[in-house]
Amino acid sequence: MADDPSAADRNVEIWKIKKLIKSLEAARGNGTSMISLIIPPKDQISRVAKMLADEFGTASNIKSRVNRLSVLGAITSVQQRLKLYNKVPPNGLVVYCGTIVTEEGKEKKVNIDFEPFKPINTSLYLCDNKFHTEALTALLSDDSKFGFIVIDGSGALFGTLQGNTREVLHKFTVDLPKKHGRGGQSALRFARLRMEKRHNYVRKVAETAVQLFISGDKVNVAGLVLAGSADFKTELSQSDMFDQRLQSKVLKLVDISYGGENGFNQAIELSTEVLSNVKFIQEKKLIGRYFGEISQDTGKYCFGVEDTLKALEMGAVEILIVYENLDIMRYVLHCQGTEEEKILYLTPEQEKDKSHFTDKETGQEHELIESMPLLEWFANNYKKFGATLEIVTDKSQEGSQFVKGFGGIGGILRYRVDFQGMEYQGGDDEFFDLDDY
């Protein structure tokens, strides 16, 4: 889905934050003891610490004893968390602390602090009976940055759009000679001069685009839109002078009635649909590549939990593709008799069968050491296997086919692997029950 690993890592970060938002939104507490604190990048830890000390004094006057103690406890937890930082991290700091009530009605303390994957320009401190995640949601909505080149006969404008923020990076005007019938014997020379000036103008636009949209040898925008009223945009997109890396990122050519800033606004309006589908298109491309490996029978693919984990262990997986709502859980169990660890991968249906958690010979129940969704385990560990993790949806036709036909888990491999002729080295310490696939 992403051409470079950094974009894939970013997608994993986004998925982690989405998951965090989901669990924070569902959490509820008694009273107002749930603290949401967001510190923007250039703020000072000392200022926030002083503000918390003042809040601590104010909270000491709360009438209800239970609420007072839980609020003071939450403020103390936040203060302890802040002591771990000398200064605010480059992207800001998000802290959630408080006592939540679980589904069983038990109280549970929550302490979360992390630096978001990109700058969060919001300052927030709230005590409430729920966590406030609006700023985090806003962080996700506008994650991709798109480049715009507005080019017509009077000048060119270069801009970017990220979420709702548009920015003009550079603009210049140009004075191109118009077509005319005068000149007599010099008419051809005039036409040649005019073509030469046009050519130089297109070259200048192409060179400026490289300076603005390529940094460190990589394109710094998710896609490019070329807009204009004449055929300059077509000329630019087909020109040899236009950098190949940028050419491959062109999403759309847009016809507009104006140049300059008005044209920029119009270009944004006319290309909103394309921009919102970029992730969708990247996903279709990725799964299309995966299906291509299967249809050509290259052997450079795997699907299902068992084969994918074998390939990961071998370091053969280049791109690990997992459905965002994969419902397989990973259990680490300790066998009482043999003192061995056993790892299970079960779907919700299989979890109901308690025989997976007991020793078949002795009937003893295994001790549960760890349980977490398999996707979460992948998100935490995929780098150890030298793979990039791509989390896909089932909204596209390809995505839906991948989830229904391949169980929502698979990978594109670096080299051919013959799974049939390979005996798994781990013996019986791993159990895969894949009847559902």
UniProtKB/Swiss-Prot annotation:
List-wise, which residues carry Phosphothreonine? 347
Please name the SMART domains in this protein's record: eRF1_1 (SM01194)
Q: Which GO terms describe its molecular function?
A: translation release factor activity; translation termination factor activity
Any idea which UniProt keywords this protein has?
Acetylation, Cytoplasm, Hydroxylation, Isopeptide bond, Methylation, Nonsense-mediated mRNA decay, Phosphoprotein, Protein biosynthesis, Ubl conjugation
Matches recorded under Gene3D superfamilies: 3.30.1330.30, eRF1 domain 1 (3.30.960.10), eRF1 domain 2 (3.30.420.60)
**In this chain, where does the modification N-acetylalanine occur?**
2
User: Where does this one sit in the cell?
Assistant: Cytoplasm
Which InterPro entries does the protein's record reference? eFR1_2_sf, eRF1_1_Pelota, eRF1_1_sf, eRF1_2, eRF1_3, Peptide_chain-rel_eRF1/aRF1, Ribosomal_eL30-like_sf
Claim: Iron-sulfur is one of the keywords in the record: no
The record describes its quaternary structure and partners as: Component of the eRF1-eRF3-GTP ternary complex, composed of ETF1/ERF1 and eRF3 (GSPT1/ERF3A or GSPT2/ERF3B) and GTP. Component of the transient SURF (SMG1-UPF1-eRF1-eRF3) complex. Interacts with JMJD4. The ETF1-GSPT1 complex interacts with JMJD4.
- Write down the NCBIfam families for this protein, in alphabetical order: aRF1_eRF1 (TIGR03676)
State the function annotated in the UniProt record.
Component of the eRF1-eRF3-GTP ternary complex, a ternary complex that mediates translation termination in response to the termination codons. The eRF1-eRF3-GTP complex binds to a stop codon in the ribosomal A-site. ETF1/ERF1 is responsible for stop codon recognition and inducing hydrolysis of peptidyl-tRNA. Following GTP hydrolysis, eRF3 (GSPT1/ERF3A or GSPT2/ERF3B) dissociates, permitting ETF1/eRF1 to accommodate fully in the A-site, followed by hydrolysis of peptidyl-tRNA.
Protein name listed in UniProt: Eukaryotic peptide chain release factor subunit 1
